[in-house]
């Protein structure tokens, strides 16, 4: 999930198939890019103003990425604590969606651009289960598979 990421994006760079969005869905790769990689566009999208949604999966994956960074020697213990505090602040500002049975059922069905890994499918299914029209949602991601599917499903991508 934390592989190669696209260049930093700004609001004006958001790929929007049908107008402006009213809230953002934060996918794990964007949160990790904001907190660990210094991606200014991701940081603005993740920590800036506005309404945000995320899956509980987003915060589990992000916390694991922080732990891996410390274990790999990229962070010391104090750096890990600082980033985890920032992650908790992001989580507190989000409406967090549980990984529910309907999300898992949707994740098990095909998406427009296959193959899709299971965790990516859970993110995409979570967005769909929010029940909003795609024109109202921007998906914030640095993951190519999420980006391709989000655009194919009619969502704006940042």
Predicted regions and their residues:
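General small-molecule cofactor/ligand-binding pocket signal
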Residues: 53, 97, 158
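Active-site-proximal, substrate-binding regions of enzyme catalytic domains
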Residues: 38-39, 57-112
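Short, well-structured N-terminal submotif of metal-dependent ribonuclease cores
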Residues: 1-59, 69-82, 155
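Residues that scaffold the ATP/ADP-binding catalytic core of kinase and kinase-like folds
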Residues: 33-35, 65, 149
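C-terminal binding/interaction regions
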Residues: 135-137, 145-158
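Active-site neighborhoods of divalent-metal-dependent phosphate/nucleic-acid chemistry enzymes
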Residues: 2-12, 93-145
